[in-house]
Each structure stands twice: as structure tokens, then as C-alpha cells.
Amino acid sequence: MSTYHHGDLRAALLRAAGKILEEKGIAGLSLREAARQAEVSHNAPYRHFADRESLLAALAAEGFAILSQDLEAAGREMGAAYVGFALQHPQRFRLMFGGLLPIAKYEDLRVSAGRAYQALVELMKSHKEIADPEAAAAAAWSLVHGLSHLLLDGHFAQEQREEFVKQVLGAVRFAAAAQRSA
């Protein structure tokens, strides 16, 4: 194992930790294992992360930043982008939304989580006829978030997934349209 890092140690540790997270889950991630995979000394992570929780918080913040970009790029197809993110990054998704981390303790995490949700609120605000964009965003998020968890937890066979996703996203659109006409 090398004690020298080339480039950005923090980024190298986050890459290694992200790989471990997706392979072994939250329980399988340690600072020591991230250091080993990043090929640095076992003490090197402490230059950037006070403890395992702060490493997990950084991974979650990074996940919310990626999710925000995906949602903003998706426009009206945010629901599909959200489900897609969950299915592509199941362990990171569980970390982000699992209640393990005290969001208020980590500024980067709080800001990046807020940005992801705000993208949905802004989409609802773009529909002037929606009387309460915050409530509409909360309702849409609840449906899509629940769908994501059901899919991750294996409650639907692989061959049923696509049709079920279409049905739920259609229900979200229908509910938004109903609120506009009410």
C-alpha cells in the first residue's frame, strides 16, 4: 500500500468509499477500507473526515448533488429521473434517505438535500394553476419516493417494473392535473 496519494485525496477517498458502499452497503464501509482501496495510509482519511459518519455524510451530499443534476436535467420527467437514480445507486439512495445521518449537523448535506427537493418545488411552481406548489411537490415526492423503495425492496418482479413505474408516474401527473383544474 502506498502512503502517497496522487491528486485530490478527498476525491480519491470518496470514489473508493462510493465503490465500497455500492458493493457492500453502509455496514461494509469503513475509513480503513476506503483508505485501503484508495491506496493511502489508514490514517490518511482523517485529514478530511473526522469519523465514519462524516465520510457517510459526504457520500450522501455527493449523492444529493448528483440527484439534483439529474432532476434539473429531466424537467417534467423528474419522477422517472428520481426512480432511475434510486435503481442505479441503491445503496447511496438508502444512505441519503435512511435517517442514519443528522442532516442539520452537515452543512453540505443539508444544502444539497434541499437543492434536490427545491428542483421539484420549482417544477410545481412553473404550473401557475397549481394553488399550493409546496403541497403538490410533497405529494409527488411521496409517491415517487415510495415507488423507489418498493422497487429497491423487490416488491415487484423485474418484468413488472417498467409498467408499474409508468402507472405511478401517470398517477402523479393525473394528481397534478386534477389540482390545476380544481
Residue ranges and their predicted role:
Residues Q69-R92, A140:
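Hydrophobic alpha-helical connector segments
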Residues G84, Q88-S126, H149, D153-Q158:
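Short secondary-structure transition hinges
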Residues I103-I130, E134-A139, E163-F174:
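Amphipathic alpha-helical packing segments from all-alpha helical-bundle domains
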